[in-house]
């Protein structure tokens, strides 16, 4: 069974998971035998303690299932830059709640767009200061 199918069958129909994305080397075809598996999971829960417990629970189980080192990221608390990479280069393998995923994406894209503006402003300011010799 391929790693994509294995991940999909493992996480499908899990009530506490909204969506699962594969990202990193396995998503862009650069994986090697020693590569780890990077998964981003959307739980749709704002309680960091509960999300961390679920990450721990699923990390052990999916690592055993895949027989690979696996890294899990909670999309619920991921930064804008990481979310941008997950949405841009990741592969969505599981959607258990399409409405919650659509809402999360709408909110995340809004934050990513705002963050991009402020990051650009900050970078322009830094470059200007360097050019001025400060």
Residue ranges and their predicted role:
Residues 40-44:
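Short hydrophobic/aromatic beta-strand micro-patches
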């Amino acid at each position: 069974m391929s790693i994509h199918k294995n991940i999909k069958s493992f996480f499908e129909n899990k009530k506490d998971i909204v969506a699962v994305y594969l990202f990193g080397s396995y998503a862009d075809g650069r994986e090697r035998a020693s590569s780890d598996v990077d998964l981003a999971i959307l739980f749709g829960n704002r309680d960091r303690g509960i999300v961390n417990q679920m990450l721990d629970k699923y990390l052990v189980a999916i690592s055993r299932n895949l027989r690979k080192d696996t890294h899990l990221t909670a999309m619920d608390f991921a930064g804008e830059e990481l979310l941008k990479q997950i949405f841009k280069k990741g592969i969505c393998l599981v959607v258990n709640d399409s409405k919650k995923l659509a809402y999360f994406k709408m909110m995340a894209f809004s934050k990513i767009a705002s963050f991009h503006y402020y990051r650009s402003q900050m970078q322009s300011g830094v470059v200007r200061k360097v050019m001025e010799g400060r």
